[in-house]
A protein has these predicted regions:
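Bacterial N-terminal signal peptides that target proteins for export
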Residues: 1-13, 228-229
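Flexible, small-residue-rich N-terminal segments that precede or flank a structured functional core
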Residues: 24-76, 198, 210-215
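A short beta-strand element within beta-rich, extracytoplasmic domains
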Residues: 72, 82-94, 218
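Proprotein-processing/basic-patch segments
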Residues: 171-172, 176-224
Length: 249
């Protein structure tokens, strides 16, 4: 009996060591995600555009500022994944030739998108509906931002120079860090604020929203290390069965 147990122990150890010596293959994968929520904050106050075709960042001709909010559901990325790259693609559908540095800032609190839908080109916004985000409210009419204009990290995670109508991509290590922290659960995912800090009137850029054909796209590349092989575990169970059978005899 002791001899059988000793043999089994040696086999288990050898199999376990060999299993540890087998390199684990890192699986690379990617996802392409559409926004699940977006909106525009209009500096005029209780205006919004939750269900509009566009969102805005920058100042209109009268010098009033707009900021956009974006959120993506990262549920398609598995737990434990290592984020390798992040790229946000946005379509500018209307803008003048002024160069504007538009930054993506990680949002620090939750916010809403409701049924408000501005008229015409949507740059003027419309009266907010219940649950909309506004310049003053994260959720209209009952919940205020801590800071008018939205609660977000003062440091941009990524910045892109935007001129006229075109497709633009934001990509940086800062975006990788944001998505990694959201996937890990170390911070809550409230998305990003799109901020154009230009003080020039008429610097606003109009972007296509998720309700538009050319909607925002978030591309994420990640890697996952598979769970260790079960060969060693099976060998342990097999030996246990052999020992128990022989003991029963």
């Amino acid at each position: 009996m002791r001899k059988n147990i000793a043999v089994c122990f040696v086999v288990v150890v050898l199999l376990g060591v060999s299993n540890l010596c087998i390199p684990q293959t890192v699986c690379a994968d990617s996802v392409e995600l559409g926004a699940v929520r977006d909106n525009t904050l209009y500096e005029e106050g209780n205006l919004s555009n939750g269900s509009g075709d566009f969102f805005f960042a920058g100042r209109n001709g009268g010098g009033s500022e707009r900021r956009a909010l974006l959120l993506f559901d990262l549920g398609a990325i598995p737990d434990g994944a290592t984020i390798e790259s992040v790229a946000l693609e946005l379509t500018v559908s209307q803008a003048n030739s002024l160069v504007a540095d538009v930054g993506l800032h990680r949002l620090l609190s939750d916010w809403g998108e409701s049924t408000s839908d501005a008229n015409g080109g949507e740059g003027g916004g419309i009266e907010a509906e219940v649950g909309d985000a506004t310049w003053l409210h994260s959720f209209y009419p009952g919940t205020l931002w801590s800071n008018p204009g939205g609660d977000f990290d003062a440091t941009a995670s990524a910045t892109q120079s935007v001129i006229g109508p075109d497709v633009y991509t934001w990509q940086s290590s800062g975006l990788v860090a944001d998505v990694q922290s959201w996937v890990d659960g170390s911070v809550d995912n409230f998305g990003w604020a799109l901020v154009n800090d230009s003080l020039v009137s008429g610097s606003a850029k109009r972007f296509n929203s998720r309700d538009n054909a050319a909607s925002p796209i978030l591309r994420v590349e990640f890697s996952v290390v598979p769970e260790p092989s079960c060969v060693a575990l099976l060998s342990v169970l097999g030996c246990a069965v052999v020992v128990r059978r022989r003991k029963a005899c």
